[in-house]
């Protein structure tokens, strides 16, 4: 059901500016959606969880405004394992079959996996076509849909093959969050917390006091969290679109997090492996503890961050089965490293972060060892089976 929450808009100002529209009912807005299409060909890329709920609605809305449109839908299995070179090739084949020309448009309907794969496909087809991010998860709305990072995974690491290719628009229909599993909602809130942790103490405090409303999917609280997160990312991406400087700060927790995801094997629906948001939550605590060890941040702030993540039901210690060397092996392949030395985003306390080069591996190994020795009661399966509110998708 569409709420009365007002539409919010955030603009990313760089070489190719675009607008992030945030609000309910946007999948029913033919003028907004059709305005993103310059040609006569479009492809909707989605997954097996999202397509049955929303692909037909997006099709109907687009064709209502553009009955001349040649429009196909391509659906992939849900889960991180779909973000592969094989599925990239399959998506390219779909564009070829469609007869897509350089003025075609690709719609990424789903979460971060679909957005990343669709963006990379759009970046490569005929050296670049338009694509529109239509995120249906909180994590995609606040993070992966904004900024133009596109990629696929390979066995050696996450997001190792990709390109910078900004979307033509981001259209975030918040009504889709009504059907989002609680585990995925929490994963998105991990990235929301990150924005407060790296640059906004006021927002961090707001998240401490608004937990119940956010977990209950209060429309006004969610809209505020999404808009504020997007404002932070748009501000940084507008100045540093290619991650040559401050944009790297958005990776707090990600070096550890990506290593966890790769070492465990990427998460699929129903699996025990941590998903991206969960891995980043653990990664933020590890980065904060490393910062404590290097005398960069007060231990009290680290406990405050850990307690906030705990309060949102997110994991904060390494899952069982991972060793420090397993993780370090993957961290050495991280894209942020320079001259073969670890480069991590570390914490300076609530609202502050910085990139630190030449981080001592022995200290990192000790932080990882300390975390593996801690007991965790976090249960991904419990969150995976928690049902969202009993609301019918519009």
From Swiss-Prot:
Keywords, ordered alphabetically: Amino-acid biosynthesis, Aromatic amino acid biosynthesis, Cobalt, Cytoplasm, Lyase, Metal-binding, NAD, Nucleotide-binding, Zinc
NCBIfam families xrefs: aroB
Biased composition (Polar residues): 371-388
Region ranges (Disordered): 371-394
Cofactor binding notes: Binds 1 divalent metal cation per subunit. Can use either Co(2+) or Zn(2+).
Record flagged with keyword NAD: yes
Entries under Pfam families matching the protein: DHQ_synthase, DHQS_C
Keyword Iron set for record: no
Function: Catalyzes the conversion of 3-deoxy-D-arabino-heptulosonate 7-phosphate (DAHP) to dehydroquinate (DHQ).
GO molecular function annotations of the record: 3-dehydroquinate synthase activity; metal ion binding; nucleotide binding
PANTHER family on file: 3-DEHYDROQUINATE SYNTHASE, 3-DEHYDROQUINATE SYNTHASE, CHLOROPLASTIC
Amino-acid positions noted as binding Zn(2+) in the UniProt annotation, renumbered to this chain: 191, 254, 276
GO cellular component, one term: cytoplasm
Example GO BP: aromatic amino acid family biosynthetic process
Top-rank taxon, per record: Bacteria
Cofactor names: NAD(+); Co(2+); Zn(2+)
Catalysed reaction, written as an equation: 7-phospho-2-dehydro-3-deoxy-D-arabino-heptonate = 3-dehydroquinate + phosphate
Known EC number: 4.2.3.4
Subcellular localization, as worded in the UniProt entry: Cytoplasm
Protein name: 3-dehydroquinate synthase
Family per record: Belongs to the sugar phosphate cyclases superfamily. Dehydroquinate synthase family.
Main location: cytoplasm
């Amino acid at each position: 059901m569409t709420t009365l929450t007002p539409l919010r808009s955030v603009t990313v100002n760089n070489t190719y500016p675009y607008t992030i529209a945030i609000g309910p009912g946007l999948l029913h807005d033919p003028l907004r959606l059709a305005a993103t299409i310059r040609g006569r060909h479009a492809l909707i890329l989605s997954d097996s969880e999202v397509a049955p709920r929303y692909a037909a609605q997006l099709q109907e809305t687009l064709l209502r405004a553009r009955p001349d449109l040649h429009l196909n839908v391509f659906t992939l299995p849900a889960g991180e394992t779909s973000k592969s070179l094989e599925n990239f090739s399959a998506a390219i084949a779909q564009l070829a079959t469609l007869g897509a020309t350089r003025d075609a448009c690709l719609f990424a309907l789903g979460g971060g996996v679909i957005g990343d794969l669709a963006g990379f496909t759009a970046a490569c087809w005929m050296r670049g076509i338009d694509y529109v991010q239509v995120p249906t998860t909180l994590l995609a709305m606040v993070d992966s849909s904004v900024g133009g990072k596109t990629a696929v995974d390979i066995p050696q690491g996450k997001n190792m093959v990709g390109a910078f290719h900004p979307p033509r628009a981001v259209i975030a229909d918040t009504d889709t969050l009504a059907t989002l599993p609680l585990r995925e909602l929490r994963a998105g809130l991990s990235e929301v917390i990150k924005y407060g942790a790296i640059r906004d103490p006021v927002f961090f405090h707001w998240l401490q006091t608004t937990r119940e409303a956010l977990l209950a999917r209060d429309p006004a609280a969610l809209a505020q969290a999404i808009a504020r997160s997007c404002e932070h990312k748009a501000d940084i991406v507008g100045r540093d679109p290619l991650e040559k400087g401050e944009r790297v700060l958005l990776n707090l927790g990600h070096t550890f997090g990506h290593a966890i995801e790769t070492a465990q094997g990427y998460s699929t629906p129903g699996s025990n492996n941590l998903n991206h948001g969960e891995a980043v939550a653990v990664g933020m605590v590890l980065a904060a503890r490393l910062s404590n060890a290097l005398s960069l941040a007060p231990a009290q702030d680290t406990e405050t961050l850990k307690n906030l993540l705990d309060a949102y039901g997110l994991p904060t210690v390494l899952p069982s089965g991972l060793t420090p060397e397993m993780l370090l092996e993957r961290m050495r392949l991280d894209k942020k490293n320079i001259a073969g030395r670890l480069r991590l985003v570390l914490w300076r306390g609530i609202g502050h972060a910085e990139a630190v080069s030449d981080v001592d591996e022995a200290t990192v190994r000790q932080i990882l060892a300390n975390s593996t020795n801690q007991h965790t009661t976090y249960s991904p399966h419990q969150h995976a089976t928690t049902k969202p509110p009993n609301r019918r998708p519009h």
